Amino acid sequence: MKQPGEELQETLTELDDRAVVDYLIKNPEFFIRNARAVEAIRVPHPVRGTISLVEWHMARARNHIHVLEENMALLMEQAIANEGLFYRLLYLQRSLTAASSLDDMLMRFHRWARDLGLAGASLRLFPDRWRLGAPSNHTHLALSRQSFEPLRIQRLGQEQHYLGPLNGPELLVVLPEAKAVGSVAMSMLGSDADLGVVLFTSRDASHYQQGQGTQLLHEIALMLPELLERWIERV
């Protein structure tokens, strides 16, 4: 427990510090009038013992510049990454828009994924949101919401995207004809995440992992429904 004298000394120190700071702020010419005294002030240093006030200030300035440089480098990296994502998305959108049929669009989508080094890309749609039944030939895209729900709860939870492996029974639900799937990037379609699922597959089990960026995946999941409406009527 601190003695009354110690508490009083701490209070006086705090008041003295505050008074000094207030005085220097109000009287900036102090440093001009007392230039030699300022140069003689020594500041504690963890390595060198003490350094001059000027050296201490310059070190702080260098550290500040270093932080600014690191932040600028990070911003540049993010800008370059975002530019790359933008052009990939723009190329995909133009390619899918130029499709002459739904099958052509799906093939272009699959080819785009292959060009990125993936095994492929697939779409599955919920029949209660799209007219997929006869007489259309789109029934192969249908995904039972009831069958998908356990997988959604297990892998996505409250999220819109999942990156990682799927087990055998799960693959049979979303990709019954797929072979040698090591990992997937899966996203719910539409702004309300209730129209279906888009999946990118890789043979590499470690290619897609939780924690990876999902910006491109998110943008594709928002873009596809409007393109699909050219060929499939919404319910």
UniProtKB/Swiss-Prot annotation:
**Ranges that cross the membrane:** none
Going by the entry's taxonomy, the superkingdom of the source organism is recorded as Bacteria
Signal peptide position in this chain?
none
Write down the Pfam families for this protein, in alphabetical order.
DUF484
**InterPro entries this protein is in?**
DUF484 (IPR007435), GAF-like_dom_sf (IPR029016)
Q: Report what the protein is called.
A: Uncharacterized protein YigA
Q: Which organism is it from?
A: Shigella flexneri
**Organism classification:** Bacteria, Pseudomonadati, Pseudomonadota, Gammaproteobacteria, Enterobacterales
